[in-house]
């Protein structure tokens, strides 16, 4: 029956089976261990160290977790053993990891069936018992947690509750007496701390799920036994097709990366875990910035290469300084092409929500967008580093195989737990490192705060030149794609017909719009855009044409619908250097009233505009018309007596001739580019006077656009002239260098092209394309020959300079090496001196402490002697002889126990002292103590 409060409304019951059900959220055992580590890390406990060990108690293998944090009161321990109580808050910038008040229950019950918690906070000491075995034995219907509380003098508080809880603990736990419980409390060093003991560990094939034998300083997950392949390493479920990193099966490796910036030391089986600043222990470190739309701030992403193992790569995703997902592959790393190998990314996703086992994030839209953005950022970093490093190391090794070292070396002080940056070249560090060992005098004191990090969250630390060059390369290679994709375009995608309403013609008119940009070569013209017009989709006062870009000129004409295979453009059929981008817009039918005026005026205006800009347009009718459209469309158009728009289209050739004259000193002749397009005819019966204003407005816009294009063409001409002058200056300098370095060679041969060029220029004849091509090839050959001569001269010059400077360089190098050795020895001596100073200081402190203890013991011995003598004197004068004897015996017993303690203390100071041969009933120990005190006083005075 569930408990009933005074109001009579029942409380919800919690079945003991829920302890096991709740623990199944941890499919990976190390995630349960991490929950217990998080409890010691959180700011309410704020432990500096946590010890994780394996021990045996009453023939049971146990896991122990001991920390030196703030401990807990009995009430706080009760909330910890209950469900959903979490009052953790941020303290001094330390953000808690725990969110749900469920970590200890799920983690401890995942590792074993029974757990005991020992804690003390300086005032009280408490013992709590959470056990599935105990609840099964007593057949409990609710979760029951016995808790015993002691005061500083080891006396129980709240006797009624504590006695019942103590009886349950002594009967059903590994500790059968109260003294054993107090001994575990004494195992907590210091006045505050917590100790957790877990037993009845989860088993797998008649053994625990942990391997304690392979590495005596680690806790590992054993290898899987495969019947066909033998033993194979453990892998997490999501990494079955990948190389498993060591953190998947080694608790020591997992704890080293568990926190983005560790604030606590973790000691596993007696050996400290070498925690690392994950974002600082990479090579070729660069930072990028992620600007999500669902956040008002930016997020920093750190990229770098793994220096230890290139097969361990991916994104390390942290939440509030705690690792959630490790080595998550994104972007190009998901492809089987060895891209992104060795690249590690670090991001702190405080804006995402982790699952309650803290091993994944909720699969929300924000998470998907973040993963997508991480993939793009990683691709940028990979492409940039691949180009940069392959240029720096021109060898056959890819960038992921180049030997790398971390960009920076950081170490954590064992006293203040602050992170300090070390200079380059320090490889070996002592087992315990303190701020006083820092070569940098600015950070040689534990009181000095940590070195500030780069807080620029707006700009990346590297320029993405690869992306810029890729865009530029695509822009340059754009003309190469047009001839290849133009024959493959399905005409049904370009020319689609639609059925209109009864009051409109069943036709959509398409208008091809070839945009002629500036001609970058005298042998080719370039098509930029091909659009389908939408006459009815825009207001009447606006132009039917799309706004032109700054770099293009326009040539538009009205066409009728083509319903059969597309017209092939022979001028681009064999051109491999050009490109076209086809943009298709759906158009809606419109009454044909406006079409005649608009089409006629557009053709005329474009002809006049092109004549002004130097472009000649000739309309040449094709001898063969295009294939007729379907009879259905034709008959439908004829059924309307008021409006008739024919769907039959002819294919006249529209020849565009553009001639540009370049300056004579450039050596470039006039080139002719011919472009054939689809001509159009629009037959209409009525015209509208209202469309004249709209057409004039269109003409005005076209004139302004043509003026802009003409101005830009003139600008490009001026730039071309400037670049030509620069090329001539460079060629002149190159010739002067050749004249200085080699003897002049006279060539009595003349080239035929020069003569032909002069003859044609005199006669006013234009050169053919073949002549221009041959001249261009000869110019290229001449440039290559000059380049080879220049490189040969440079090589000769460099060899001469190397031969003269080799001896001097060798001497300078030897001196530099010697000087470097001297500085290294000096640094080493300085470090050793500081270490010795620290050891001397520690020894002096220990010596003074021992001296004070000796003095206290000596005074106590003297007091006991005086009381003993006084008691003996009083006993001799008393009438009854038996009572003083017993009193003296009690004093002598205290004196003997005190001498035993003094003897143990003296054995630590005097190693040669054999306590087994010492008689504690006489004053031998007192004399030895006096001698040691005299020697210590003499040493301190000297």
Curated annotation (Swiss-Prot):
<keyword id="KW-1017">Isopeptide bond</keyword>
<dbReference type="Pfam" id="PF13589">
    <property type="entry name" value="HATPase_c_3"/>
</dbReference>
<dbReference type="GO" id="GO:0140374">
    <property type="term" value="P:antiviral innate immune response"/>
</dbReference>
<keyword id="KW-0399">Innate immunity</keyword>
<dbReference type="GO" id="GO:0140002">
    <property type="term" value="F:histone H3K4me3 reader activity"/>
</dbReference>
<dbReference type="InterPro" id="IPR036890">
    <property type="entry name" value="HATPase_C_sf"/>
</dbReference>
<dbReference type="GO" id="GO:0005634">
    <property type="term" value="C:nucleus"/>
</dbReference>
<feature type="cross-link" description="Glycyl lysine isopeptide (Lys-Gly) (interchain with G-Cter in SUMO2)">
    <location>
        <position position="205"/>
    </location>
</feature>
<dbReference type="GO" id="GO:0051457">
    <property type="term" value="P:maintenance of protein location in nucleus"/>
</dbReference>
<dbReference type="InterPro" id="IPR011124">
    <property type="entry name" value="Znf_CW"/>
</dbReference>
<feature type="binding site">
    <location>
        <position position="446"/>
    </location>
    <ligand>
        <name>Zn(2+)</name>
    </ligand>
</feature>
<keyword id="KW-0863">Zinc-finger</keyword>
<protein>
    <recommendedName>
        <fullName>MORC family CW-type zinc finger protein 3</fullName>
    </recommendedName>
</protein>
<comment type="subunit">
    <text>Homodimer. The sumoylated form interacts with PML (via SUMO-interacting motif). Interacts with TP53.</text>
</comment>
<keyword id="KW-0391">Immunity</keyword>
<feature type="region of interest" description="Disordered">
    <location>
        <begin position="623"/>
        <end position="654"/>
    </location>
</feature>
<dbReference type="GO" id="GO:0009791">
    <property type="term" value="P:post-embryonic development"/>
</dbReference>
<feature type="compositionally biased region" description="Low complexity">
    <location>
        <begin position="630"/>
        <end position="639"/>
    </location>
</feature>
<keyword id="KW-0158">Chromosome</keyword>
<dbReference type="GO" id="GO:0016605">
    <property type="term" value="C:PML body"/>
</dbReference>
<dbReference type="Pfam" id="PF07496">
    <property type="entry name" value="zf-CW"/>
</dbReference>
<keyword id="KW-0832">Ubl conjugation</keyword>
<comment type="function">
    <text>Nuclear matrix protein which forms MORC3-NBs (nuclear bodies) via an ATP-dependent mechanism and plays a role in innate immunity by restricting different viruses through modulation of the IFN response. Mechanistically, possesses a primary antiviral function through a MORC3-regulated element that activates IFNB1, and this function is guarded by a secondary IFN-repressing function. Sumoylated MORC3-NBs associates with PML-NBs and recruits TP53 and SP100, thus regulating TP53 activity. Binds RNA in vitro.</text>
</comment>
<keyword id="KW-0539">Nucleus</keyword>
<feature type="cross-link" description="Glycyl lysine isopeptide (Lys-Gly) (interchain with G-Cter in SUMO2); alternate">
    <location>
        <position position="657"/>
    </location>
</feature>
<feature type="cross-link" description="Glycyl lysine isopeptide (Lys-Gly) (interchain with G-Cter in SUMO2); alternate">
    <location>
        <position position="658"/>
    </location>
</feature>
<keyword id="KW-0694">RNA-binding</keyword>
<feature type="cross-link" description="Glycyl lysine isopeptide (Lys-Gly) (interchain with G-Cter in SUMO1); alternate">
    <location>
        <position position="604"/>
    </location>
</feature>
<feature type="binding site">
    <location>
        <position position="416"/>
    </location>
    <ligand>
        <name>Zn(2+)</name>
    </ligand>
</feature>
<feature type="binding site">
    <location>
        <position position="413"/>
    </location>
    <ligand>
        <name>Zn(2+)</name>
    </ligand>
</feature>
<keyword id="KW-0862">Zinc</keyword>
<feature type="cross-link" description="Glycyl lysine isopeptide (Lys-Gly) (interchain with G-Cter in SUMO2)">
    <location>
        <position position="558"/>
    </location>
</feature>
<dbReference type="InterPro" id="IPR041006">
    <property type="entry name" value="Morc_S5"/>
</dbReference>
<dbReference type="GO" id="GO:0000785">
    <property type="term" value="C:chromatin"/>
</dbReference>
<feature type="cross-link" description="Glycyl lysine isopeptide (Lys-Gly) (interchain with G-Cter in SUMO2); alternate">
    <location>
        <position position="743"/>
    </location>
</feature>
<keyword id="KW-0597">Phosphoprotein</keyword>
<feature type="cross-link" description="Glycyl lysine isopeptide (Lys-Gly) (interchain with G-Cter in SUMO1); alternate">
    <location>
        <position position="657"/>
    </location>
</feature>
<dbReference type="GO" id="GO:0005654">
    <property type="term" value="C:nucleoplasm"/>
</dbReference>
<feature type="modified residue" description="Phosphoserine">
    <location>
        <position position="563"/>
    </location>
</feature>
<dbReference type="Pfam" id="PF17942">
    <property type="entry name" value="Morc6_S5"/>
</dbReference>
<dbReference type="GO" id="GO:0035064">
    <property type="term" value="F:methylated histone binding"/>
</dbReference>
<feature type="zinc finger region" description="CW-type">
    <location>
        <begin position="404"/>
        <end position="454"/>
    </location>
</feature>
